[in-house]
């Protein structure tokens, strides 16, 4: 495999010295880019785009051609695992993801298979290998998965939800059924992420988009517990270097200490957590990724630069910061504003890394 020309992102995740703060954006390959829309039109629909290694590679590379980003992230979807378990993923226009066969009872959970990632999810591994070849060592490639709790929200609700009543009913009325589901999902995620690492992912991230809807007790029992199991099961060395693991719970600000104790290398922060406070609490254990409100990108470039400057100053001197948004970039952000953001991070961060 190619020697990395820019390993700033991997170094920052391990709290090693860098010349400037690395930056990438969640959903950096996406609908705010006209070239993405054009490629998706060629594919026909979202899952066809994910399942075609060449097209998935193309959309992964598109933001890197526009912006000096410090990492590429695999173009895929968190719902590939439940789809491979046989739930029948499809996308309703304007409605988001849906499942033809959602989980309704214990029998549904018991019959769920644990997918073989090179078989049922081989298209993801093909995309990873294709992207690594295309990157040719320019920047690292991030692999990812949804967390068991977040995957379960879609599998039990049958799609997106605001109140999660079906899943919370299962959690409170049939906790053992939910634990069985989460355990199967954790085993599936371990196999899936390890296959991504073997295929060439140089860092992995676990997205716990919906962990923040839980009480503290329930978060520990039904979400963090299973992410901890995954971290324990991951390959942590490959191609002669460490493979860093980042956990991201949206709304996870109250639980950073417990998240840092899982053995992960970094925590993603949403914009509701103060990064200075987060660094005081866990900065001696993990790196921090984040955490600009994605809506700042609607503002003029001068305002974007001001926000970047504020967050850099809030984190302060030294290592262990990967700049990112606090969640995915919105689809109607002007591409030039994303460019202003990336350039501002690089331009304004150098003084924070001088010895």
From Swiss-Prot:
Alphabetized Gene3D superfamilies for the sequence: 3.20.20.210
Quaternary structure (record): Homodimer.
Range of residues in the leader sequence: none
Physiological role: Catalyzes the decarboxylation of four acetate groups of uroporphyrinogen-III to yield coproporphyrinogen-III.
Localisation: Cytoplasm
Entry's EC annotation: 4.1.1.37
Site feature: Transition state stabilizer: 77
Species assigned in the record: Yersinia pestis
SUPFAM superfamilies named among the record's database cross-references: UROD/MetE-like (SSF51726)
Phylogenetic lineage: Bacteria, Pseudomonadati, Pseudomonadota, Gammaproteobacteria, Enterobacterales
Domain of life: Bacteria
Name of protein: Uroporphyrinogen decarboxylase
GO biological process, one term: heme biosynthetic process
Pathway named in the protein's UniProt entry: Porphyrin-containing compound metabolism; protoporphyrin-IX biosynthesis; coproporphyrinogen-III from 5-aminolevulinate: step 4/4
GO MF terms, alphabetically ordered: uroporphyrinogen decarboxylase activity
PROSITE patterns, sorted: UROD_1, UROD_2
Keywords associated with the record: Cytoplasm, Decarboxylase, Lyase, Porphyrin biosynthesis
Chain residues that bind substrate: 27-31, 46, 77, 154, 209, 327
Keyword Lyase annotated: yes
DNA-binding in keyword set: no
InterPro entries: UROD/MetE-like_sf, Uroporphyrinogen_deCO2ase_HemE, Uroporphyrinogen_deCOase
Enzyme class: lyase
Family: Belongs to the uroporphyrinogen decarboxylase family.
């Amino acid at each position: 495999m190619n020697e990395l020309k820019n390993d700033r992102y991997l170094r920052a995740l391990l709290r090693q010295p860098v010349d400037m703060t690395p930056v990438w954006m969640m959903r950096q390959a996406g609908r705010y880019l006209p070239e993405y829309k054009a490629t998706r039109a060629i594919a026909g629909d979202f899952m066809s785009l994910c399942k075609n290694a060449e097209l998935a590679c193309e959309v992964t590379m598109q933001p890197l051609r526009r912006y000096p980003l410090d990492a590429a992230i695999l173009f895929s979807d968190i719902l590939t695992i439940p789809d491979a378990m046989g739930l029948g993923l499809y996308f309703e226009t304007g409605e988001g993801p849906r499942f033809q066969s959602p989980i309704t009872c214990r029998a549904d959970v018991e019959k769920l298979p644990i997918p073989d990632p090179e078989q049922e999810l081989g298209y993801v591994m093909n995309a990873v290998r294709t992207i690594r070849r295309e990157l040719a060592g320019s920047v690292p490639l991030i692999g990812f998965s949804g967390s068991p709790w977040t995957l379960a929200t879609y599998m039990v609700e049958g799609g997106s939800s605001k109140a999660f009543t079906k899943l919370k009913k299962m959690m409170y009325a049939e906790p053992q059924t939910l634990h069985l589901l989460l355990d199967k999902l954790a085993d599936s995620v371990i196999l899936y992420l390890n296959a991504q690492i073997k295929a060439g992912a140089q860092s992995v991230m676990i997205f716990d988009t919906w962990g923040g809807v839980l009480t503290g007790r329930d978060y520990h029992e039904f979400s963090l517990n299973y992410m901890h199991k995954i971290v324990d099961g991951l390959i942590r060395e490959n191609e002669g270097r460490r493979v860093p693991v980042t956990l991201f719970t949206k709304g996870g600000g109250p639980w950073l200490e417990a998240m840092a104790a899982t053995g992960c290398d970094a925590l993603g922060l949403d914009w509701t957590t103060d990064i200075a406070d987060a660094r005081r609490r866990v900065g001696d254990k993990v790196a921090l990724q984040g955490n600009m409100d994605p809506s700042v990108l609607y503002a003029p470039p001068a305002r974007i630069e001001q926000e970047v400057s504020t967050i850099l100053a809030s984190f302060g001197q030294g290592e262990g910061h990967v700049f990112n948004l606090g969640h995915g970039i919105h689809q109607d952000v002007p591409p030039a504003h994303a460019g202003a953001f990336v350039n501002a991070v690089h331009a304004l961060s150098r003084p924070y890394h001088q010895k």
